[in-house]
Amino acid sequence: MESHKIQLLGLDLSQLERLALDHGESLYRGRQLHQWLYQKGVDNLDDITVLPKAWRNSLIQKGISVGGLVEVNRFIAGDRTIKLLLSTGDGEIIETVGIPSGNRLTICVSSQIGCPMGCQFCATGKDGLKRSLKVNEIVAQVFAVKKAFNRSPSNVVFMGMGEPLLNIEEVLSSICCLNKDLGIGQRRITVSTVGVKNTLPQLAELALQFLGSVQFTLALSLHAPNQKLRESLIPSAQNYPIKLLLEDCRHYLDLTGRRVSFEYILLGHLNDHIEHAEELADLVGGFQSHVNLIAYNPIDGESFQRPSNQRVNIFIKTLQKRGIVVSLRASRGLDKNAACGQLRSMNM
C-alpha cells in the first residue's frame, strides 16, 4: 500500500492490517489502529498511545494521518439541532448537522463542497461546486457530530451539501465504512439525489459490488409533479425528463429489490396546489413508495414562500385520499440556517 498522504479514516480492518504489515509491524497493530480509529474516535495518530512511538512518528513522517476535520464553528438551534462548520485539509468548509430526537440522533452529512445542480430553492448550489469529498471527509463528519453530542448516531442521511450521485464511489465507500466499521445498519442510512442521468443503474451495480447487498434507502428529490415545473426549479432536469427518471427508479428497484422514496419540497402558491398533489399521486402511485414532504425553508436572496399550514394539510390529505403514504418532515435547526436547503460553505 502506497503510504504517500494516506488518510486512515475509511480504511477497513484488512486494509489497516495490510498497512501495518507493509511497515514492518504485526497484524495486531492493524487491529489496534482499527479499534482506536472507529471505537475510540481519535483525531491524531499521536493519540494512539498503544502503538510504539517510533512507528507513530514514522507514519506521520510518511504523510499518513487520521484524515479528520477541524471544527471551526458551532451553531446550536433552539430545538437542540447542532450545525458544525468543519475545515478540510485544504481549508475548505463543510457544513454538517446533528438532529436529536428522543433517543435518536440523525446526522446529515455532505458529499461535496458546494453543488453543481443549481436547485433554485437551495442555498448550497448558489456558489457552484468546489470539489467532491473523499471518504475520510465524509466519515469524519459523523465523528465530529458524535463528539459534539457525546453519543452515537442512530441514522445517517446524505442530505447535506452536494449531489451524492456525482460522487458515487466515495459515498458508497463511506457507507461501507459506516456500516462495517462503525456498526450503523444500512437500513438506517439514506442517500438523497435530485436525479443525475445514467447514474441510478451505476449506483445499483456499484452498491452491490461495494456492499454485497443494498439495504440503504434511496430518496429521490422530485419537488415537482410535471416536467415544465421541475425544469423551472431544477435546471439539471432539462436533460433528465421525469418519465425517464421514473423508469430508472423502476430499474433500480428491479436490480436491488429496494423501493425508492420520494421527497417533495412545498413552495407556497407554486407547487402546493391540489392539482399538483393529484399529479404527484398519478406519478408515484404505482411505486407503493413513501412521499416525504418538506415545507420550504427560507434562504437569502430568494422570493419563494413557505406554505401555510392549511395548504400543507390540504396537500397531505389529497395524497392520502389517493392511497399515498405521506409524512411531513419537521424543519429542524431553522433558526441557525441548519434546515433542509439552507446549508452553505461560507458562514465562518
From Swiss-Prot:
Cystine connections: C108-C340
Molecular function terms from GO: 4 iron, 4 sulfur cluster binding; metal ion binding; rRNA (adenine(2503)-C2-)-methyltransferase activity; rRNA binding; tRNA (adenine(37)-C2)-methyltransferase activity; tRNA binding
Gene that encodes the chain: rlmN
Sites where the protein binds S-adenosyl-L-methionine: G162, E163, S192, S221, L222, H223, N297
Organism annotation: Prochlorococcus marinus (strain SARG / CCMP1375 / SS120)
Note: Reaction proceeds by a ping-pong mechanism involving intermediate methylation of a conserved cysteine residue.
Top EC category: transferase
InterPro entries: Aldolase_TIM, Methyltransferase_A, RlmN_N, RNA_MTrfase_RlmN, rRNA_lsu_MTrfase_RlmN/Cfr, rSAM
Lineage: Bacteria, Bacillati, Cyanobacteriota, Cyanophyceae, Synechococcales
Co-factor remark: Binds 1 [4Fe-4S] cluster. The cluster is coordinated with 3 cysteines and an exchangeable S-adenosyl-L-methionine.
Subcellular location: Cytoplasm
PROSITE patterns, alphabetized: RADICAL_SAM
Taxonomic superkingdom: Bacteria
Protein name per Swiss-Prot or TrEMBL: Probable dual-specificity RNA methyltransferase RlmN
Record family assignment: Belongs to the radical SAM superfamily. RlmN family.
Enzyme nomenclature, EC number: 2.1.1.192
Reaction(s) catalysed by this chain's protein: adenosine(2503) in 23S rRNA + 2 reduced [2Fe-2S]-[ferredoxin] + 2 S-adenosyl-L-methionine = 2-methyladenosine(2503) in 23S rRNA + 5'-deoxyadenosine + L-methionine + 2 oxidized [2Fe-2S]-[ferredoxin] + S-adenosyl-L-homocysteine; adenosine(37) in tRNA + 2 reduced [2Fe-2S]-[ferredoxin] + 2 S-adenosyl-L-methionine = 2-methyladenosine(37) in tRNA + 5'-deoxyadenosine + L-methionine + 2 oxidized [2Fe-2S]-[ferredoxin] + S-adenosyl-L-homocysteine
Alphabetic keyword roster: 4Fe-4S, Cytoplasm, Disulfide bond, Iron, Iron-sulfur, Metal-binding, Methyltransferase, rRNA processing, S-adenosyl-L-methionine, Transferase, tRNA processing
GO cellular component: cytoplasm
Major location category of this protein: cytoplasm
Any one GO biological process: rRNA base methylation
Function summary: Specifically methylates position 2 of adenine 2503 in 23S rRNA and position 2 of adenine 37 in tRNAs.
Catalytic residues of the enzyme: E95, C340
Residues holding [4Fe-4S] cluster: C115, C119, C122
Keyword flag Cytoplasm: yes
Start and end residues of each Radical SAM core domain: 101-335
Alphabetized PANTHER family for the sequence: 23S RRNA METHYLTRANSFERASE, RADICAL SAM CORE DOMAIN-CONTAINING PROTEIN
